[in-house]
């Protein structure tokens, strides 16, 4: 485009130059000088630059040419005209040079403009390319915007539909809200009415409960003071009883020392009796030898028949005494052997029972937790009854053994004392006559195991160990009684409470159900009651044991068997078994707690299941658990 415009401009400039040269071409006619003279305007025409049109000169030349009457003046001055023309042409040339210069300048300007236009065109082309690229990117962006617009329109339609649904739901929810508010207002009104009605009742109930709690608190305080006083009295009684026990122990030790001294004397007497028996045997052998010897030719004085009969009787008596003494010694040795076997068996049973007790003590620690107490109270009551029965059985067996040993020792001592009280056996005829008339009496003897002082001391230590074991068993029995009584009392208290329920009583969590009414005072009262009950049961059991120990051999205690039964048991070589069910029934008949409503189903359940008495897996309740439970 720029090149075409440049060519067009150059062509236009060339045309202008041709026209200018044509206009300024030199054509002067012959009658020009005359015209200049007449007109008087020759210098003006020359100065005007010869701009006369060629048509006029041509017309003047042709107008004067055919005429032959041209003046000489006009023809005489052609040189002057040409000089004028030359001057005019020089002027025109200078003007043309100026115009050429101006044209060259214009050309330079035009070329400069062309270069600038080229640069501008290049810039425009570059800008055009950039614009085309931008147009393409804009087209792509336009397409993307169209797609986005389409998606936006679709989403707008979706949201419009959703907003319509939400508006409908909002209307429904507002309607539902209005309905619920109306219902709520009605319910609140009814509740206010009911609250107003119940407030009066609740006030009366709370006042009644408050009064009852105050009464119970006063009763508990009174009971606490009474229990403290009784606890102090029991402590004093315990001190007195401990002093009494110390005195009894010293008395028993003195008696045992006396018995040991008497046994030593009896041993000496036995040795003397053995010597007498040997002397009698020697005399008997001498008599036999004398009787067996032949009579001399001169017989001496023959003894009378009375003397011979007396000697025979004495011989028979001595032989009977020897046989009775041998039999008695054998019987006593057998009794001692059986007693030792039974003691060993009993020790083995006690050892096994201690192992079971240790195992059950571990299980009891788990059962002592509140969860186990709440879960299986009936099983615990049954186990407590079972353990109590087993402890009673062991106590009866130990009591039987102690009573049997004591009765045997008492019989031996009484027999020895009675024989010691009799007059000594002489060698005279009167003494032989009196002995012959009386029935033959057996000679007392001491067990072979008691021949030495060491055996006697070991036997006494064994008896002390058994006594200590029986005391421990009685303590455990007393604790079981106390624990069962405490459990029944707490369950009965829970059942008798106005706000209590049968479920809590059935669960058996007595000390866990203590509320704010008891507090620390209730715990202290419970601890004092526990100590009093345990100590009273312990005193009763120990008094019974002392009474059984002080009973003579011919008058056995109420819990001990007769000597004939003991002898029969010794012949069979085993201990008499005790029925746990019968003891449990007897205990149930004697137990004052059966009048309570909570104790009856427990005893009934125990009677319905007699196999529980033979079960060895029994939880052992030790004294160490009691203070921990009180915490």
From Swiss-Prot:
Residue spans crossing the bilayer: none
Positions of region (Disordered): 1-76, 352-379, 423-445
Pfam families hit by this protein: GM130_C, GOLGA2L5
GO CC annotation terms, alphabetical: cis-Golgi network; Golgi cis cisterna; Golgi cisterna membrane
Compositional bias segments (type: Basic and acidic residues): 352-362
Keywords: Coiled coil
Name assigned to this protein: Golgin subfamily A member 8T
Family: Belongs to the GOLGA8 family.
Biological process (GO), any one: Golgi organization
Coiled-coil region: 86-148, 224-411
């Amino acid at each position: 485009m720029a090149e075409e415009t440049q060519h067009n401009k150059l062509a236009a400039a060339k045309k202008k130059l041709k026209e200018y040269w044509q206009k300024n071409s030199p054509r002067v006619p012959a009658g020009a000088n005359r015209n200049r003279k007449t007109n008087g305007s020759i210098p003006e025409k020359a100065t005007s630059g010869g701009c006369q049109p060629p048509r006029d000169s041509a017309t003047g030349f042709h107008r004067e040419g055919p005429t032959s009457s041209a003046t000489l003046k006009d023809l005489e001055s052609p040189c002057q005209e040409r000089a004028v023309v030359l001057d005019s042409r020089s002027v025109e040339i200078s003007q043309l040079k100026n115009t050429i210069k101006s044209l060259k300048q214009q050309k330079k300007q035009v070329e400069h403009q062309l270069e600038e236009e080229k640069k501008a065109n290049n810039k425009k082309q570059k800008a055009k390319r950039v614009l085309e690229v931008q147009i393409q990117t804009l087209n792509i962006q336009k397409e993307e915007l169209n797609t986005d617009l389409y998606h936006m329109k679709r989403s707008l339609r979706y949201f419009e539909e959703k907003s319509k649904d939400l508006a409908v739901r909002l209307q429904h929810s507002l309607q539902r809200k209005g309905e619920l508010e109306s219902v709520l207002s009605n319910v609140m009104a009814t509740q206010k009415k009911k609250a107003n009605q119940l407030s009066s009742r609740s006030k009366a109930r709370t006042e009644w409960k408050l009064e009852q709690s105050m009464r119970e608190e006063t009763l508990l305080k009174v009971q606490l003071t009474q229990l403290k006083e009784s606890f102090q009295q029991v402590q004093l009684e315990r001190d007195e009883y401990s002093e009494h026990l110390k005195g009894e122990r010293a008395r028993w030790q003195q008696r045992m020392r006396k018995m040991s001294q008497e046994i030593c004397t009896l041993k000496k007497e036995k040795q003397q009796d053995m010597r007498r028996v040997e002397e009698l045997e020697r005399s008997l052998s001498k008599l036999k030898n004398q009787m067996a010897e032949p009579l001399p030719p001169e017989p001496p004085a023959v003894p009378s028949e009375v003397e011979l009969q007396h000697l025979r009787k004495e011989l028979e008596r001595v032989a009977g005494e020897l046989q009775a003494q041998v039999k008695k010694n054998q019987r006593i040795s057998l009794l001692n052997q059986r007693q030792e076997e039974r003691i060993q068996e009993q020790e083995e049973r006690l050892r096994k029972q201690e192992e079971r007790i240790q195992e059950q003590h571990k299980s009891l620690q788990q059962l002592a937790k509140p969860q186990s107490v709440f879960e299986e109270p009936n099983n615990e009551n049954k186990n407590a009854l079972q353990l109590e029965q087993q402890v009673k059985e062991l106590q009866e067996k130990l009591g039987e053994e102690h009573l049997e040993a004591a009765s045997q020792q008492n019989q031996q001592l009484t027999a020895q004392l009675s024989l010691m009280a009799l007059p000594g056996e002489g060698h005279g005829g009167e003494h032989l006559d009196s002995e012959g008339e009386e029935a033959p009496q057996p000679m007392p003897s001491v067990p072979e195991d008691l021949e030495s002082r060491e055996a006697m001391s070991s036997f006494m230590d064994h008896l002390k160990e058994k006594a200590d074991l029986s005391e421990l068993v009685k303590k455990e029995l007393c604790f079981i009684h106390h624990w069962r009584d405490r459990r029944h009392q707490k369950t009965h208290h829970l059942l008798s409470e106005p706000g209590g329920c049968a479920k809590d009583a059935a669960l058996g969590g007595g000390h866990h159900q203590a509320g704010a009414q008891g507090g620390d005072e209730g715990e202290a009262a419970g601890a004092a009651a526990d100590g009093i009950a345990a100590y009273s049961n312990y005193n009763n059991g120990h008094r019974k044991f002392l009474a059984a120990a002080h009973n003579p051999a011919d008058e056995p205690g109420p819990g001990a068997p007769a000597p004939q039964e003991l002898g029969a048991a010794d012949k069979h070589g085993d201990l008499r078994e005790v029925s746990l069910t019968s003891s449990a029934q007897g205990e149930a008949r004697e137990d004052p707690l059966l009048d309570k409503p909570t104790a009856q189903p427990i005893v009934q359940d125990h009677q319905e299941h007699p196999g529980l008495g033979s079960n060895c897996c029994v939880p052992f309740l030790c004294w160490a658990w009691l203070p921990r439970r009180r915490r």
